[in-house]
Structures are given as C-alpha cells and as structure tokens.
Amino acid sequence: MVKILKNLLYQLNKGKHGNIMNEAFWSEPQLIIELREILRDKRYFIVIDDIWDYSVWETIRYALIENGNGSKIITTTRNAHVANQIGGVYSLIPLSLIHSRKLFHQRIYGDEDKSLPSHLAEVSDIILNKCGGIPLAIITIAGILASKKGMTHEYWSKVSRSMGTGLEDSPQIQKMRRILSLSYYDLPPHLKTCLLYLGLFPEDHDITREYLIWKWVGEAFVRKEHGKSLYEVGENYLDELISKGMVKPVEFDGCSKATTCRVHDMVLDLITSLSNDEHFLTAVGGQQLMPLPSKVRRLSLQTGNAEDVRLLSTVSFTHVRSVTVFDQALNLLPGISCFPVLRALDLSDCEQVDNHRFKGICKLFHLRYLCLRRTSVTEVPKQIGNLQFLQVLDISLTEVKVLPSTFVQLTQLVYLNVSAWTRLPDGFGKLECLQNFPGITVSYPSMLHDLGRLTELRNLKIIKFIQCGENYDEPFLECLSNLVSLEKLEVNYYLGGPDFGLSSSLSPGPQRVYSIDMLRSTFYAVPRWMSSLSCLSALEITIRTLAVQDFEVLGKIPSLTDLYVWVLEPTGERPERLAIDSRYPFRCLSVFRFWSYGMEVVFSRGAMPNLQTLDLDFQVRKTKDLGGNFYFGLENLPLLQRVPVKIDCYCTEPGEVEAAEAALQKGVDMNPNKPMLNILKYGEMG
C-alpha cells in the first residue's frame, strides 16, 4: 500500500517528490495526508489500474480528497466482486470480429486498413475467434505471426491448432502468460487446484456446473465449511473463478446463475503450461505438443489415435489417482488393474462401457468418485459394496433397473444419481451422508420411511409416485418433517389428498428449504404448513381450485420472492374476482406467475408492494364468464416493470380479445411505473 501511495505522489508532483520511491521514512498515514493536501484545491482525473482487493481501494479513496471540484477517478480490476463493491461498474465487452481484425492487422502490418493475403484470411479468422475478442490475446498471437516465417499458411495453421494446448515458448507467449498468471497467483491454493483441474477438458468444451462441482468433490478439492453442503462450497469456488475472469460463463438459468461454462483458449494455454510444470494433470489427445511424463497423477484421455497409443506406452499408471475418458479415447484405457490407487474414474458417455468392465471397477477399493452416466451398463454388481470410500456415484441414463442389497454399504455417499426406472434396495436409509439425490421414483409408501432417514439431504427430486391405490399423504408428510437439512425440493406426479395440507406446520420440518417445485403435482389447496417455512423464496405449485385461504397461506411466507401458481379448475360459483390486498403481505415477492383458465384475481391497493414481474396466462372466454370484464387492478402494483401475458383466444366472441387487450393496456398505462406489456395470443381460429 505504501508503494502505491508513493507512486501516486511521485506522479502528482515529481518536482517535490522525485526521489520519494527511495525515501524510507514515509508511513501510510503521512502519505495520505500529503496526498490530500496536494489535491485539496485541484480538479483531478486519476486512473488506478488493476485493483485486486477492496481494502486497497478503501485506502486510496480516502487519500483522494473529495473537494467538490468535479474530479473523476477510474479504476480497473479483473475481479467482478471488487468492481461491484466499488460501484459504478462498466463492463468491457470483447472486441467484435471486425475490430479484432483491425487490431490484428495493426499489429501485423502497422496499418489496420491493410488486408491479409487471401490464403491467410480464413485461418486468421479462426485464430481471432479463438482469441475471443481479448486484445491481449490478439496482440500476443499477432506478434508471433508477424515474424518472417509467420506469413505461411502452414505456420499459421500450426499456431491455430496449438492455441489452448501449450503454445510454443516464444517471448510474446511468455509475456502473455506472465500477465495472465497474475490472476492465477492471486488465487488462494484451493482455487488454484480447481482451476488447474479444468485442463482435463478439451479445447472449447462446454462444462456443466453440477458435473464440474461434483468432480471437484470427488477429487477432494472441496473443503468442508460449517453450515454448508459440499456442493454449496463448490458452487462458491466456481462463482469466484467466474468472478475473477478465469472461467467464462456460457449459459445461465432464470436466476442468472451460470449453468454451463468454458475455459478461454488463452487461459487453457496457461493452465496447460502450469499443469505441466507442476505435474498436476496430463492430457492425451487434441494438439498435445509435449512428451508425457513417466509418472502421471491425473490423466485425461481425449482422443485415441495411433500417436496417442505410442505416447501412453511410456507411462506408468501406478501413481494415477484420477482418470477421465472421453468417448473417442476409450480404446486408450488400459486394464483397471493398472490403477491400484485410483480415486476418481469418469467414463460418462462412453457407450462401450458394459457390465464386465463395471465388475472390474468394483476392485478399485480407493474410489471416491465414479461416473458411468450414459454408458451401456445394465446391472450393478453386488461387489459395489466393496467401494467403502465412494462419495459420488452417477449411473443415470443407463438401463440399470435395480440396485443390489449390498448397495446400502456405501455409507460415505454424498451424491447419488440414478435413472427414473432404477429401484432402490430396502434399507437405503442407511446412506445417512447423502446430500444430493436428484432423482428417485417412490414405488410404495414404506420407501418414504427410508427417505426420511436421510437427514443430511440438501437437494431432493422425486421423479414420480407410483400410486397403485396407495395413500402417500401421511408417510410423505412424516418424511418431509424429518428432512431437516433440505434446501431444494422438487416433487413430480404426486396427487395430494384433501388432508395433505391441513397441518399448520411440520415439526421439526425442512426449515432451511429455499426452493420448492410442485408444479407437476396436484393439490387440493396450498398446504398450510408452507407459511412456516421462513427461508422459502421460490415456490411453484399446482392446485385444483383457488380459495381465499390459499393466498392467506402464500402471503405469510416471509421470504417468498418468486411464486408460480397454476389453477386447474376455475371456481364457477365465486360472485366476483378474488381481491389480493394488504391483508396478504407478500412483502418480498418480486415475480408472480399465475396460470388459470379464467383470471380469478384482481389486485387492490397495497397488494404485493415489491412486485416487478407479473406473468399471466388465461383464457378470454372463461375470464369473461367469471368476472364480466378484464379489469385486474394492474395500476395498484407500484413497482411493476414487466407484464408478459399469454391469452388463449379459443371460442371467443367477436371483440372479446380486443377488449381484453385494451383493458390490459389501460391498466399498465394507469400504473405510475409505466411497466412494459407484452401480449402473446394463441388459439385463434383462422
């Protein structure tokens, strides 16, 4: 910090402080006082480049006095979290292909308007696409290609193929790596490990969030933190790598959370270089340019050509702890007996993996992670019980119909993913460490007793209930009462009885649950016990008919921000629309999606004071029959911003659709916040 403040003083007043960098007597408070004195009556414009920590900014901000003279400060940072803390963020977007070409040509020829020879045009665009619009990458690669030998198509193609897999160690590449490595060396040790691990994926490979995090867990990269599941901790790791710009998000969910990510080619090049230096991970395939080490700890098999076979023949597998095989490289995988200390094995999408190979895998007694997703496995051998250290198991999208009784010996499992048709053995409640169970079919009520014993469950998805005339209500409620750690619940194809929601609370109940999705199930009413779930922020539910009591329950859920209600049958005997007003607090609700054949609600003054998005779907004919008009009270929602509406025009009389549209438009026009209305009509007769 002292060095930064000295540098500021030197640049602001070289006449007085020309030798300040060599003066040892300055303390941080003295430097701050001197800076404030120099700037006291000045109008200044200062750029602080590459801030890594918010505490550094706080000190600098205090030193740069606010004197009311219209001064400006610009800071740059690679850390999105730091940027958000400082405020006033302007996010730079990557250069377009056109501007990338201009920068590229400027570096090659010294003239941005000069064009490349025709034989280099196509390969240059491939190179620029790999640079991803990042100026540093473009300048670095252009510096390599600007050499005399660089003007040949053969050489440019070689550079293009090598990007992301260990580029040649030219001075330009070394300089770029040094710049990028600043971000790497700023990471804490556990994030360095997680980042280097991404070198196992091929270039431009899309990586799903959940898949990556559970691989980290299986590799023991994720540290336990009090009050958090291993998956939550892993999510924080990934979010931090994205925030620091080391991982690029590709796809997002409705909450703007990255569901798929990718490693930029230039970062992958850095990872490959560092990984080779530290003997962290060895990737076989792609454009591998370096000889393989004699000993390997983590192995990624990406392609299976003859050269790769030759390379692997020189490798010892006795120290390999992790193997990931991509489908086209399965022929490279030697016998399982070659990996005596293997802890993680990923054969997902390798269709040639069958039952015989699975039986051999059950001899890998040190395994912590096993993924056989989308393979040709149809049976789980009884020897599966030998894998006493197994924490992560994924056998989803296979033809496995039943798990053996020995499966319940896997008492260290924290993640289990099976196909919808896979039947669990009796006593699976012994898997008491299980935290994530993203797919179970409940075939009979007694299964819910075992499910209720999994008190560490954070994430549960019930794919379906096989009814067979059984009444699941009582055992299901008892099960939910016992799942005290549950945070996310999805229940599909459940037909709740009339008594399912009568209890006002579940004791002790899933008090930590923040998301419940019951949209593909059906209930007579909103269960009363939901109002006792203090952490519940997102709820999707389908009910048969709508009653005042439903909004009394929903309105009392204190943290509810996102609500989706689907009503199957409109209440024909109701004389007027159900008014939502200040009696139903909905203090935090920001998104309300309401689907019903007939629009049964009207918003009164004081309703949903923080609502920003109102998503409606209704049938014009039924709505007109129920209420006689299309007035919904949209002007009474003070913070409303968006009103997407789907209108079913089936069986409408002339003018009714236009009347509905006009009423909706009038409602938003009367709203002081002037929300945006978007109407989509369907079911119109030609």
What role is predicted for each listed range?
Residues 1-34, 214-216:
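Post-nucleotide-binding-loop coupling segment downstream of the phosphate-binding loop, primarily
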Residues 2-9, 71-122, 140, 158, ...:
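Alpha-helical sensor/transducer elements of the RecA-like P-loop NTPase core
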Residues 28-95:
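A conserved switch/coupling segment of P-loop NTPase cores
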Residues 65-67, 115, 144-194, 199-363, ...:
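Surface-exposed helical/coil interface segments that assemble multiprotein signaling complexes
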Residues 121-133:
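A short helix-loop-helix "switch/interaction" segment in the helical subdomain of ASCE P-loop NTPases
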Residues 130-140, 188-193:
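The conserved phosphate-sensing helix
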Residues 260, 303, 327, 344, ...:
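Structural position within Leucine-Rich Repeats
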Residues 433-438, 450-463, 469-686:
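Non-core capping and flanking segments associated with repeat-based/extracellular domains
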